[in-house]
């Protein structure tokens, strides 16, 4: 019973960290990575919300630009529209599209660091809420007389250790992203 609660809490905490990492990949650092275009959608064959990576290959042209090569050359105009809508500036090179990523200004980098910290704080809050849910489940087991007070204390301590470990992981992810932002 306690192990199920701990495993469930660990799984949910890991999902919170994964969600944070996914969110942080979409923050532009000035370095070009294909993950920046994960949320770009295009109007392909009548479907207005087709992900870009399903209609084109995305690769790094160099450290500050991406190359989008459509699988169907007739899709170039739609891909350009999708990129413009996502606030990118595409340059068409015949059968491919280049996207330049200018390095952000110092002021913009500081704004991005604040955004990263805010996202990190959101992940920490989610982890603390998961801890609270797990502790409530443990308290319910005591109330139902399924476990003793000693087991409750041990379970709560284990949940707290999980929480501390996962919050350290969030801090590391946030610190790494801040370092990446400020080193451009």
Swiss-Prot record:
Superkingdom of this protein's organism: Bacteria
InterPro entries, A to Z: Ribosome_recyc_fac, Ribosome_recyc_fac_dom, RRF_sf
HAMAP family xref list: RRF
Matches recorded under Pfam families: RRF (PF01765)
An example Gene Ontology molecular-function term: ribosomal large subunit binding
Native organism: Stenotrophomonas maltophilia (strain K279a)
One annotated GO biological process: cytoplasmic translational termination
Gene that produces this protein: frr
Protein name as catalogued: Ribosome-recycling factor
CDD domains, per database record: RRF
Sequence similarity: Belongs to the RRF family.
Keyword terms, alphabetized: Cytoplasm, Protein biosynthesis
Subcellular location: Cytoplasm
Biological function: Responsible for the release of ribosomes from messenger RNA at the termination of protein biosynthesis. May increase the efficiency of translation by recycling ribosomes from one round of translation to another.
GO CC terms in record: cytosol
């Amino acid at each position: 019973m306690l192990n199920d609660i701990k495993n469930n809490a660990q799984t949910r905490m890991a999902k919170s960290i994964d969600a944070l990492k996914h969110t942080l990949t979409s923050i532009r650092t000035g370095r070009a990575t294909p993950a920046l275009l994960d949320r770009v959608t295009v109007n392909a064959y009548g479907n207005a919300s087709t992900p870009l990576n399903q209609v084109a290959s995305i690769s790094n042209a160099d450290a500050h630009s991406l190359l989008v090569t459509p699988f169907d050359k007739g899709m170039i105009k739609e891909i350009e529209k999708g990129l413009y809508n996502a606030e990118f500036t595409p340059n068409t090179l015949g059968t491919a599209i280049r996207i330049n990523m200018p390095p952000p200004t110092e002021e913009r980098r500081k704004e991005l660091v604040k955004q990263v910290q805010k996202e990190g704080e959101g992940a920490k809050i989610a982890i603390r809420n998961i801890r609270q849910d797990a502790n409530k489940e443990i308290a319910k087991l005591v109330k139902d007389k399924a476990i003793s007070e000693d087991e409750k204390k041990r379970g709560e301590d284990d949940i707290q250790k999980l929480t501390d470990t996962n919050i350290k992981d969030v801090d590391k992810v946030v610190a790494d992203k801040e370092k990446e932002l400020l080193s451009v």
